[in-house]
């Protein structure tokens, strides 16, 4: 591996990613991909998202509006872009990686009430911007091992010109002034639309976007030109001239075949080389060993497997972003392409509906969610799959639905969750003791669930222990309800096994059927998808995809469960690329 080139020691560098013209240009993926490139050059990189909405966090936001809530190890409910950061950087981030306007104003108002401003008139400048700056600069603090990041990449949410983003942009401008221009870099993402009638690419939106950014005191150092095709050199030269950006900093980023190709696109345009030169960073050549192996698995699969995701929020795929990425990573482990079948849970309430939706799939995933809508459909999908030996993986609410279905199968006909039916005679899923006030409306809903990483102990001979190759694991959680221990013995009569619990044995963390009864029907109260990486697939997802591939390869029996079938777990080994 090439050694780092020697340069004088410098302070942590700050790189800000902004966006203009329209939203959804891929600022998060651009920043994540650049972070991956800098990491592959031997640099320590961390990332942060500044969100301009007034919510304190996305924990209580509608999934149809916001997408998934990404939970960090320390229990913060954050924006889904933080998931991209973790997956591309292959490192865990904390709650400080996501800052919202709601957090900033809450903190400033609390300080004012405590008298910390000593009678000052509290204003956006300096008090709000100072609070934002303190969150940005805090990202440069040493980690638990004493290592200070070389680069902090901060994505500023929203679009330049939006009133909500102005305090964050002003704070970023002030950071550049305070840490020094040589230690700060602004990367602006803009749209270059193609006008089909005239057959032209238009640069005027980008010029106007940069003009708006310059009007508030920020001159971008580089431009990411988003387009459905390559931007010709002549247009790049024009944009460089009109926007006063070095030609080396004008980066064409046409649509890529997959999100994992974006680092290659940026590297081809030499953005990473330009950044390390401008910031005078120590660096080595990019080590592509791991990423090239990933891209080979992405683009050259040996086989295909079809997975049904039976969910409530399928109209917005971002509501299940980490789940779908974890499934794809599980496929990469087996050199397989995962085809997603999006199934509305309501469609599976009747066995005929489940048969129509699931007849030609190789596995069923039941993701998390809240509320009663679609629950009977999730349970119906589990019942259909259980009777046919179809592999199932249930996450959080998915585990609870597996337990309800098992209870009903042994005659507990009223089995339900206290969440869906508070008056149920058989609450096999009950409210956690410390969550009752929140459920009753007597405490805040936001930030009060069982959140973050918790340990679990697995039974040695279980499917999940073989998948993890361990009996002590830690996973991230986000829930208020748990398996009711009073029903464990009766539910076990169905053959469902409580194969993992909290260390004290009180809280059920994993359930499964023995392989002799079903090849792979596993549920976890956790959200293991949050810890999956494209280069290090989560073992539970890799095992699930392995079982689905086995199911596809075997003769499908319409009703009878096969006596023996490999569950794919024994295939799990550390691939050379996982490092």
Curated annotation (Swiss-Prot):
One of its GO terms (molecular function) is ATP binding. Homotetramer. Allosterically activated by GTP, when glutamine is the substrate; GTP has no effect on the reaction when ammonia is the substrate. The allosteric effector GTP functions by stabilizing the protein conformation that binds the tetrahedral intermediate(s) formed during glutamine hydrolysis. Inhibited by the product CTP, via allosteric rather than competitive inhibition. The keyword Disulfide bond does not apply. It holds the Pfam family GATase. One of its GO terms (biological process) is 'de novo' CTP biosynthetic process. This is CTP synthase. One of its GO terms (cellular component) is cytosol. CTP binds at residues 23, 162-164, 202-207, 238. Keywords: ATP-binding, Glutamine amidotransferase, Ligase, Magnesium, Metal-binding, Nucleotide-binding, Pyrimidine biosynthesis. The lineage of its organism: Bacteria, Bacillati, Actinomycetota, Actinomycetes, Mycobacteriales. Residues 1-281 are annotated as: Amidoligase domain. Its EC number is 6.3.4.2. Mg(2+) binds at residues 81, 155. UTP binds at residues 23, 202-207, 238. CTPSs have evolved a hybrid strategy for distinguishing between UTP and CTP. The overlapping regions of the product feedback inhibitory and substrate sites recognize a common feature in both compounds, the triphosphate moiety. To differentiate isosteric substrate and product pyrimidine rings, an additional pocket far from the expected kinase/ligase catalytic site, specifically recognizes the cytosine and ribose portions of the product inhibitor. ATP binds at residues 24-29, 81. The active site is at residues 396, 527, 529. Catalyzes the ATP-dependent amination of UTP to CTP with either L-glutamine or ammonia as the source of nitrogen. Regulates intracellular CTP levels through interactions with the four ribonucleotide triphosphates. SUPFAM superfamilies: Class I glutamine amidotransferase-like (SSF52317), P-loop containing nucleoside triphosphate hydrolases (SSF52540). It comes from Mycobacterium sp. (strain JLS). L-glutamine binds at residues 369, 397-400, 419, 480. Residues 306-554 form the Glutamine amidotransferase type-1 domain. PROSITE patterns: GATASE_TYPE_1 (PS51273). It is an enzyme of class 6 (ligase). Pathway: Pyrimidine metabolism; CTP biosynthesis via de novo pathway; CTP from UDP: step 2/2. The keyword Acyltransferase does not apply.
């Amino acid at each position: 591996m090439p050694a780092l080139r020697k340069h004088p020691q410098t302070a942590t560098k700050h790189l800000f990613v902004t966006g203009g013209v329209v939203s959804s240009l891929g600022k998060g993926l651009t920043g994540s991909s650049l972070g991956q490139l800098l990491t592959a050059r031997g640099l320590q990189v961390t990332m942060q998202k500044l969100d301009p909405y007034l919510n304190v966090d996305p924990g209580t936001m509608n999934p149809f509006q916001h997408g998934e809530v990404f939970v960090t190890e320390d229990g913060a409910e954050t924006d889904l872009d933080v998931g991209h950061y973790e997956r591309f950087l292959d490192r865990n981030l904390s709650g400080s990686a996501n800052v919202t306007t709601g957090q900033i104003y809450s903190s400033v108002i609390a300080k004012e009430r405590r008298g910390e401003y000593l009678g000052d008139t509290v204003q956006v400048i300096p008090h709000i911007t100072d609070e934002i700056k303190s969150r940005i600069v805090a990202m440069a603090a040493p980690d638990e091992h004493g290592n200070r990041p070389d680069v902090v990449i901060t994505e500023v949410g929203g679009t330049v010109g939006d009133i909500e983003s102005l305090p964050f942009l002003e704070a970023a401008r002030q950071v550049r002034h305070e840490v020094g221009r040589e230690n700060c870099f602004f990367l602006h993402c803009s749209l270059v639309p193609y006008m089909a009638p005239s057959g032209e690419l238009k640069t005027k939106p980008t010029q106007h976007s940069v003009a708006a950014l310059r009007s508030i005191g920020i001159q971008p150092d580089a431009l990411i030109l988003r387009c459905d095709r390559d931007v010709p050199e002549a247009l790049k030269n024009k944009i460089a001239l009109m926007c006063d950006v070095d030609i080396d900093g004008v980066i064409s980023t046409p649509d890529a075949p997959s999100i994992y190709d974006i680092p290659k696109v940026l590297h081809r345009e030499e953005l990473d080389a330009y950044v390390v030169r401008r910031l005078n960073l120590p660096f080595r050549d990019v080590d592509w060993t791991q990423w090239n192996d990933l891209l080979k698995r992405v683009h050259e699969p040996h086989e295909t497997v079809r997975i049904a995701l039976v969910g409530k929020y399928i109209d917005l795929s971002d509501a299940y972003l980490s789940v779908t990425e974890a499934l794809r990573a599980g496929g990469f482990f087996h050199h397989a392409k995962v085809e997603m079948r999006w199934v509305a849970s309501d469609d599976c309430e009747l066995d005929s509906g489940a048969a129509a939706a699931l007849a030609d799939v190789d596995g069923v995933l039941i993701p998390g969610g809240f509320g009663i809508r679609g629950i009977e459909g999730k349970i119906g999908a589990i019942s259909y799959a259980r009777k046919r030996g179809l592999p199932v993986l249930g996450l959080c609410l998915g585990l609870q639905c597996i337990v309800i279905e098992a209870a009903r199968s042994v005659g507990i006909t009223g089995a339900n969750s206290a969440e869906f039916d508070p008056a149920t005679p058989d609450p096999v899923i009950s409210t956690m003791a410390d969550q009752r006030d929140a459920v009753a409306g007597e405490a805040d809903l936001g930030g009060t669930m069982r959140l973050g990483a918790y340990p679990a102990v697995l039974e040695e001979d279980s499917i999940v222990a073989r998948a993890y190759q361990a009996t002590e694991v830690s996973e991230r959680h986000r829930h208020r309800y748990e398996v009711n221990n009073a029903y464990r013995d009766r539910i076990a009569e169905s053959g469902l096994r409580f194969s993992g619990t909290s260390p004290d044995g009180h809280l059920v963390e994993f359930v499964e059927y023995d392989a002799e009864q079903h090849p792979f029907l596993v549920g976890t109260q956790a959200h293991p998808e949050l810890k999956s990486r494209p280069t290090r697939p989560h073992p539970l997802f890799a095992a699930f995809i392995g079982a689905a591939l086995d199911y596809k390869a075997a003769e499908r029996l319409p009703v009878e469960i096969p006596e023996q079938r490999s569950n794919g777990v024994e295939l799990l080994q550390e691939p050379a690329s996982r490092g």
